[in-house]
Amino acid sequence: IRDRSPSRGLGDVYKRQSMASIPEIFGSMVFDDVSMKERLPKQTYKALKKTIELGEALDINVANIVANAMKDWAVEKGATHYTHWFQPMTGITAEKHDSFINPTDDGRAIMEFSGKELIKGEPDASSFPSGGLRATFEARGYTAWDPTSYAFVKDDTLCIPTAFCSYTGEALDKKTPLLRSMDRISTEALRILRLFGDEETTRVLTTVGAEQEYFLIDKKLYEKRKDLIYTGRTLFGARAPKGQELEDHYFGTIKPRVSEYMKDLDQELWKLGVFAKTKHNEVAPGQHELAPIFTTTNLATDHNQLTMEIMRKVARRHGMVCLLHEKPFAGVNGSGKHNNWSLSTNTGKNLLDPGKTPKDNAQFLLILMAVIKAVDEYQDLLRLSVASAGNDHRLGANEAPPAIISMFLGDELTEILDSIENNSEYANKGSVRMEMGTVVLPNIKKDTTDRNRTSPFAFTGNKFEFRMLGSALNIACPNIMLNTIVAEAFCEFADELENAEDIRTAVMNLIKREYKEHKRIIFNGNNYSDEWVEEARKRGLLNLRTMPEAMRYYIADKNIGLFMKNSIFTEPEVHSRYEIQLENYTKVLNIEALTMLDMAKKDILPGVSAYVKELTETANAKKALCADIPCDAEIDLVKKLSSLTVCFSKKIAALEQALLGTKEVEGVQELADYYKDHVFAAMQELRAVADEMEINTSSKYWPYPSYGQLLFGVYD
């Protein structure tokens, strides 16, 4: 009998807690505003709030008081260490743990934590990706406390969210440019609001809710697959007899083992202040989704990194493994991450809410037009912000949006903008109620537009849903790009409108002009269709199918100019990110190729050969017993597998040759192109032969768990 207890330690304590206790546990491991107010002197609390809300410098005396209160709180929660928790350009989080203990004169220890230790840390910067910003011998780097993101206790450690920079001041992380972009869009959005008489708002915040898809598989099966262990995805594997064809998994009943995992996951995330809201089965067998309530972008980024970490950790407690790779299994849907992005004022207004009469809401229409302009002019930046080796498997595969950037606005907003362009009257259809055909069901108010799940960038009522992100991606990069390009559009609009005599007329004229220039980016149809690919080409839209194609645009003059003008990146910071991401792409493919060779030579070839030997011995035994006993089935299968084995050996040699060729290639872009065109192509050919061999080989001899076992193994 398998032990399916969902948790150990603290997880058991609240596993069965009632829903009424959620407010008590929510944020219990976070040093949030409530904790600050309770534990800090009134003046210290006010000073810290000014730092958080207005960006004022934090006095060291205030920092010392905050640090001591934070330490006392953390120790009460069981913490013995602290860490500056940051997000280097690896895309995952990093942490170095230091204990609170300090020696006393009598040889004993006390627990101390100073303001200096809170504000600044010094991790080794040479061991993280820097893209040439730091040489190996230039090791000094700094972490700086981000007070806008709350500290929390995890695994008996006080985690302090921080930014990470080099000794010379260059950003070496994801958070620093994200915070810069948030400042930039706030500044420019305020200029837009002032045009419409809003003098009350002092800050505009971008908010994000990141829907996280993932797979769950049995841990014992996972441990038998080298490819999953080394790369996070299956490099070989014939399709299971059943996949997602019946469409019976999406929103289906959650199986007990998965349900227990989800309950435990919710509890862990709630303790850390993550607003985990929705959970359900996704399309593919073994695939699921968790969606949070939106929050400010830097906090949402921290929360999503925490969510992915906790997902993996909790899964292992349940005897499962959480796969966050974008395409762990061929033949079924991969996993993405929808980035729900909006703009809110510090007074609580959603600037992307069209209101009841959007045609009369000039402020909303101007902001909408700025987003349209931004997405059209900087398609390349949005595309490259989601580029990765893993995401290349998803985009354009009829399971995720294509690699072509377009926007879905829906019928109502498109018709309003068309009417402005054509100087025509917009015919408001008004609200419609749906007749359900039976008296027992209520008449439901129908939305003004349908949803388009194939669109990469869709307006969904009061936010934009950017759907191209891969499941493993750090959401900082796409949000840096979104914030920056929209800030640039706001800036251009404000420059033009601030001197206008009649603001409404000037706004409508601007919208008319800009819509005519940028409406090519709007497409409300089927983004999966071949017809759209051709139509997009005619419209002049980019179709950057792979990461190496997209990354070239990172260092385009117009994009470097944009980043520098808005103080998001310096030119060296742009080049460093370009190089780091291309290097990561080639390293990922190299690891995958080496793993395939290891599996092919050490496991698959010997396994198939052993099966061929058994078939041969069976045929010979039949003939020895009686010459009249037919052996056609064994002989035909031996011939087929022998032929496949010869082909497989040739494909192994071809992949080895392709890898040798990488040594002759110079330049990060050229090397990435080579891996895409030669190494990956050889990997695909090797896999095709192996999958055919698997179909024809006894499961007794096939060295790895099958797709059927992996995808359906958590339901037994």
Model feature map: region roles:
Residues 511, 516-716:
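C-terminal amphipathic alpha-helical interaction region
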Residues 62-66, 86-88, 116-117, 164, ...:
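Active-site-proximal loop/turn and secondary-structure-junction residues that shape catalytic pockets
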Residues 139-324, 333-336, 343-579:
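Glycine-rich, acidic/polar active-site loops that bind/position phosphate-bearing ligands
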Residues 1-17:
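Single conserved hydrophobic/aromatic residue that forms the stacking wall/gate
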Residues 91-106, 126, 225, 232-234, ...:
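Short linear, low-complexity motifs centered on an aromatic residue
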Residues 15-34, 187, 191-193:
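Flexible inter-domain linker/hinge segments
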Residues 25-139:
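Active-site core of metal-dependent hydrolases
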Residues 62, 86, 114, 292-294, ...:
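Active-site proximal loops enriched in glycine and acidic residues that flank catalytic Cys/His/Asp
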